[in-house]
UniProtKB/Swiss-Prot annotation:
It comes from Bos taurus. This is Uncharacterized protein C1orf54 homolog. It is found in: Secreted. It comes from the Eukaryota. InterPro entries: DUF4634. GO terms for cellular component: extracellular region. Keywords: Glycoprotein, Secreted, Signal.
Amino acid sequence: MDVLFVAILAVPLILGQEYEDGEELEEDEYYQVIYYYTITPSYDEFGVNFTVDYSMFESENTVNRLDEKVEASETTISYETDRADHQKPVIEKPVTMEPQSPDLNDAVSGLQSPGPLLLSWALIQGVMYFL
């Protein structure tokens, strides 16, 4: 890479010099030399390792399991005023919601109607006709 960089910088400087005896090169006599080197790394020294680290997937599964197993205790709410004996405490259970996965039918519903498909096909055919 360094050789290519030096060659690109040095060639115009060498070819663009003015001669002392008054002889100058014409513009059509100029030429530029560029050397291209391709460096291909050798992988013979290193063993290829296609090991997949499953720890990320395991931690994702743990997080998903924790989301589903939310344990909440019952909550007692009493609306106390001066005369608390006339009111009964209200017991509410907390609502636990499981994470919802996207429904596959929602993704496929756009494919069930042929309208957009026919419109895009007609548009492509029209463009190809005019080209």
